[in-house]
Amino acid sequence: MSIDSLNWKILKCLQRNARQPNTEIGREVGISSPAVSERIKKMEDANIITGYFTDVSPMEAGYQFKAIITLRAFMGKLKPFLEIVKTYDEVINCYRITGNENIVMEVVLKNQKHLESFIDQLIFYGETKTQIVLSHVVKNNALKPVK
């Protein structure tokens, strides 16, 4: 399924507010609410829309630190790490990447001691580098049509 210009308009609305009623979306894009529902359903079935998420504030949830941690896996440790990383509550995003490091993780931590403890778990799998996030400059930027 290709994403036509009308579907992109609907996606723009949903990316801005996934809870926006279909009647409002329809008004904004110029079609009926049932037509919006049908298009959304087709995009869900085609895995264009893969889910709807709640954005929770890490600070309000009790986490004082957000960090970016890269891991350069030791020989033979990458595959086991790719399984174990799924079990870490601290990891909110994890990417396998090219370059000197194999992994980039976005993690949330309660405090400095928690960070130290988490890094201690990771060093079994490889060499880590940690950067503390100071501020979130771009957050959940909406996807736009490919040019």
Task: Please report, for each region that a protein language model flagged, where it lies by residue.
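A compositional/biophysical signature of low hydrophobicity enriched in polar/charged and small residues
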Residues: 1-147
